[in-house]
């Protein structure tokens, strides 16, 4: 089974290009095992990271993602007190 994750974020003014470049680098790292495919989508002032991965790698890959988020959090605006800097959505990919 494969999982699809969409992580929504909104860079602070002046950090958009740097954040997108950093995200491109992160999602292409070879140590991200279990990744089947990945994309970056932009719309208006938001950036969406879209990743398809093997379901059995979801937990370990999510931990890598949180470590990465901690390195770029200063570049992101908070959505609200609950979601904070990202709005994630993950579910089973139906083919």
Named regions from a protein language model:
Residues 10-21:
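Short, surface-exposed ligand-recognition loops at beta-strand->loop->(often short) alpha-helix junctions
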Residues 1-11:
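Short glycine-/aliphatic-rich beta-strand segments at the starts of folded cytosolic domains
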Residues 4, 37-38:
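Short hydrophobic/aromatic beta-strand element in the GNAT-like acyltransferase core
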Residues 46-52:
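A generic structural motif
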Residues 11, 42, 53-54:
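Short beta-strand segments enriched in hydrophobic/aromatic residues
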Residues 85-95:
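Short, low-order "capping/linker" segments at domain edges
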Residues 25-37, 52-86:
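An amphipathic, aromatic/His-enriched active-site/gating alpha helix that lines ligand/cofactor pockets
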Residues 39-45:
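A short beta-turn/loop motif at secondary-structure boundaries
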